[in-house]
Design a protein with these regions (language model features):
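Non-heme Fe(II) oxygenase catalytic core, chiefly the N-lobe of the double-stranded beta-helix
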Residues: 2, 11-25, 29-37, 48, ...
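Catalytic core of Fe(II)/2-oxoglutarate
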Residues: 354-423
Length: 423
């Protein structure tokens, strides 16, 4: 049989598989999310195999028409210059304004820490992002819809503000939580963040093939050693961040090449949530979908069995050189475990992904690694299947600008891998 014939048969077989629809689920003690459909996955609204994408776009357009997002922008822009009083606290339009407030208010940080502005959303509605590959953008008949959706997504930054916060040095976690080592699985269970060490043999992190061949196995070995009860670890993709990179940044999914990101995600968020943690795992196991790592070919029954036990999604961030600016910062689970999250929908042609945003709390417990070196790996949990409240479900994170760094400090250059760990 020719390879093309085999691929066609495999694709047809996949298309006949019933879509995986995650049941409604949330952490014990956590309030419902701010989400469409009462938190149900858009997979529940599948039409002829579209995985709910049409329903998601319809809801996005209706939300734009309702005007609540524009009302948030209007409120910000109609407020006189200076701090903006919100129900969460004082927010600031500009980073520099928030820095001045921090100085004037004499906000202090502990040793190894720093007081900084972090950008949070102040829009409590779910958000929608129609990815660039969605066929809507190429349909002339939907030009008006595309224009409205493009403007709404571009305006999302106008629905956020800077808020003052204090970062603690993650290396000093034991000072805040006695007997809790930052380099332990117990730290991940309690806080949703932890640290580890790696001396990688990967020489070129801009070479996607070398990263897959050398770095992915290193990361999987590290995860299995870090979590002694784990039975399997799968690294499934990665991102490279380097604002100053002068080579080819082009992404090529077919060649498992993520490209090189010039921008840092300067908004408090998490990559997954109750639904997408399970959906992403399932599509990797049964369809090998968007997988840059080891191929997976589980049957539905085998995936059911694997996912019936505990599994987690862990991101691991490692610098290529010591970080001087645009550090990666992490928030600990106990400080927001009773807080609703806001769902962000990413609409593809064949699925609707889900991420999360959070509104500000002064009590949010943030950590960083000042001067993070190339052998220091920061770990953050994006999803945990345990929902009884006994362990952290996830952390959230952001990039930020370090006000104490020299003006000529180089931007962060690092690699972030995404993984699932199975117990």
């Amino acid at each position: 049989m020719e390879q093309n014939d085999f691929d066609a048969i495999q694709e047809a077989a996949m298309s006949e598989v019933e879509p995986y629809v995650p049941i409604l689920q949330r952490t014990e003690g956590q309030p419902p999310p701010n989400a469409a459909n009462g938190g149900l996955s858009y997979m529940s609204f599948d039409r002829n195999g579209d995985a709910g994408t049409a329903a998601a776009i319809e809801t996005a357009l209706q939300q734009i028409a309702d005007g609540e997002g524009q009302a948030v922008i209007d409120k910000i822009e109609s407020t006189p210059p200076g701090p903006i009083e919100t129900k969460w606290g004082l927010g600031f339009r500009r980073y520099a304004e928030c820095i001045e407030y921090i100085k004037d208010s004499n906000i202090k940080a502990p040793e190894g820490g720093v007081a900084i502005p972090l950008r949070y959303t102040i829009d409590e509605q779910p958000s929608y992002s129609i990815v660039s590959s969605n066929k809507l953008w190429q349909d002339p008949a939907r030009e008006a819809q595309a224009k409205a959706l493009r403007k709404d997504e571009k305006d999302s930054v106008r629905r956020s503000l800077y808020f003052p916060l204090v970062l603690r040095d993650a290396r000093r976690i034991e000072e805040y939580y006695p007997d809790l080592s930052p380099s332990s699985p117990e730290c991940m269970d309690k806080l949703g963040i932890s640290l580890t060490h790696l001396e990688s043999e990967c020489e070129n992190f801009y070479d996607a093939a070398e990263v897959e061949r050398v770095y992915y196995p290193e990361m999987e070995k590290l995860l299995l050693e870090f979590f002694p009860d784990a039975k399997d670890a799968l690294v499934f993709n990665h991102d490279v961040f380097d604002k100053e990179y002068e080579g080819d940044r082009t992404e090529d999914q077919d060649k498992k090449n993520p490209g090189v990101n010039a921008n840092y995600a300067n908004l408090v968020h998490n990559d997954l949530n109750d639904n997408s943690g399970r959906v992403r795992c399932r599509e990797l196991l049964t369809r090998n979908l968007r997988n840059f790592g080891r191929e997976q070919h589980y049957t539905e029954a085998e995936a059911d069995a694997k996912m019936s036990r505990r599994f987690m999604s862990i991101n691991l961030a490692k610098p290529m050189q010591t970080v001087r600016q645009n550090p990666f910062v992490l928030c600990a689970w106990p400080s927001f475990s009773d807080q609703s999250y806001i769902t962000g929908y990413r609409v593809y042609d064949d699925r609707v992904g889900e991420t999360t945003r959070f509104t500000y709390r002064p009590e949010h417990e943030w950590y960083w690694l000042p001067g993070q070196t190339p052998t220091e790996v920061s770990m953050l949990k994006c999803y945990d299947s345990v929902i009884d409240g006994s362990v952290s479900r996830w952390s959230f994170h952001s990039a930020c600008v370090d006000p104490t760094a020299p003006t000529d400090a180089p931007c962060r250059k690092n690699i972030v891998v995404r993984s699932f760990v199975f117990f």
